[in-house]
Amino acid sequence: MSKIVFFCIPAYGHTNPTIEVVRELVKRGNQVHYYSFYEFRSRIQETGAVCIPCDDFMPPAPKDIDKKVGKDLSSLVDMTVDVTLAMEDKVLGELRAWKPDCIVSDSICIWGKLYAKKLNVPFVCSTTTFAFNQQTARLMKQSLSELLRMLSGMPRINARLRQLRRHGYEIRQFYELLQNDNDTETIVYTSKEFQPMSETFSDKFTFTGPSIAVPKPSGHKKSRPLVYISLGTVLNRQEDFYISCMKALKTEAVDVIMSVGGRTDISGLGVIPDNFQVIPRVN
């Protein structure tokens, strides 16, 4: 029997792929402690794992977070450092006392990775979409304004990295926080055939495909096609997009399930066509 710790960010798209993995680990007799958030506690506890909420340590999300996600690197580093240091005393104390055999942390939940390295605990990276390394980074084209924003933020980023080093976290460059290296055991919840530049990743990367439970029958009549529309769990406040989808498909012979996220005001989307089911999320 092993003791395994999971860390994840407060996002369904990052938590959901781990649920059945955790359930299977518990079923096999392992003990699992999962550092997550109140919103996900019931789902995690249903697996038999212990959920440890971290809500009180998260800084308030900026109002313009939708514009910053994936674009403002210095803000991401700020949040990472703030959360890592805010939870440090609590989490490191608990980890030292419990003595886990392994730490599994989401690729965006960087504090889990930092704690594992600081305590010299074997680390596994959980990657919910595509793995990211220096080679795949070249595929991401940046505009001049994005490059200038990144360059202007480098002094701030380097200052925060120095702060981490003063607390015992051996981080030399900021990209070490974000990318997957070929020496780290990594689970990727997509097929290798879908991974860009898959040949650049070592055999430490296990491409499992989706990790989901067998779905219950939905009751949908299969006489017409069923269309599912979703923008994920982070950048989903896109009212114009949802309205365009309804206009495009309202007269088509299809049924549509459109997941718009918990922060989208469904009443603000106007009249919902009869062939549409608009909901915050799909279980």
Report each predicted region and the residues it spans:
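Motif I (Walker A/P-loop) of helicase-class P-loop NTPases
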Residues: 18
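Active-site proximal loops enriched in glycine and acidic residues that flank catalytic Cys/His/Asp
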Residues: 8, 36, 231-233, 258-262, ...
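A donor-sugar binding/catalytic signature common to diverse glycosyltransferases
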Residues: 22, 103-105, 275-283
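Nucleotide-activated donor-binding/catalytic signature segment of Leloir-type glycosyltransferases, i.e.
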Residues: 224, 258-260, 264-281
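Histidine-centered catalytic micro-motifs
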Residues: 15
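Conserved sugar-transfer catalytic core signal across GT-A, GT-B, and GT-C glycosyltransferases
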Residues: 21, 112, 245, 282-283
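Nucleotide-activated donor-dependent transferases that construct or modify glycoconjugates
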Residues: 1-12, 21
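Nucleotide-sugar-dependent glycosyltransferase catalytic domains
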Residues: 2-3, 27-226, 231-254, 268
